[in-house]
Amino acid sequence: GIAGMMIDFMDRDDQEMIRIQEEFLAKAAKHHLFVQFHGACKPSGLSRTYPNEFTREGTLNYEHCKWDKDTDADHDIHMPFTRLLAGAADYHLGGFRALPKDKFKIQQSNPYVTSTRCHMLAMYVVLESYLGMICDTPEAYEGQPGFEFLQTVPTTWDKTVVPDASVNEYVAVARRHG
């Protein structure tokens, strides 16, 4: 059997779409399935009633690096203070083809990300997402430093502490699993 599903291309946030999403969650819960909403609006609180909602995109995401350079570390520093307050995010992390913004070039196949590998790895701990993903092809990770971390980093945490943060400037997050 299957454990869950990704539902995509719900690019609106009107009352009817929220009702449709709730119906998806209710039916999936009856069958003990998780749901990942991709290409969906910001969270509306449904995950409080339906904890089978694992993640929801509702963000400017690294998939946009295929056509622009707006998703970068400057964008990411807003996330813990804005979008993540509403719930876990489906966020494409782990791009190992990382370049600084001044060297970045748009490329549809094997795209680059405007970041650093260290930043990409840190975001797996900073951002809350119950469904850890990598956003690149297998060849981008084979034999690369940091890939072992991606294979073992937890997606749930027993304790989270934010020892220091300044809105839209920096955030330090410490998490414990087990």
Task: List the predicted regions and their residue ranges.
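Aromatic- and carboxylate-enriched substrate-binding clefts and catalytic-loop regions
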Residues: 1-112, 116
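Solvent-exposed, flexible loop/coil residues
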Residues: 58, 95, 100, 125, ...
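Glycan-recognition and catalytic regions of carbohydrate-active enzymes
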Residues: 136-178
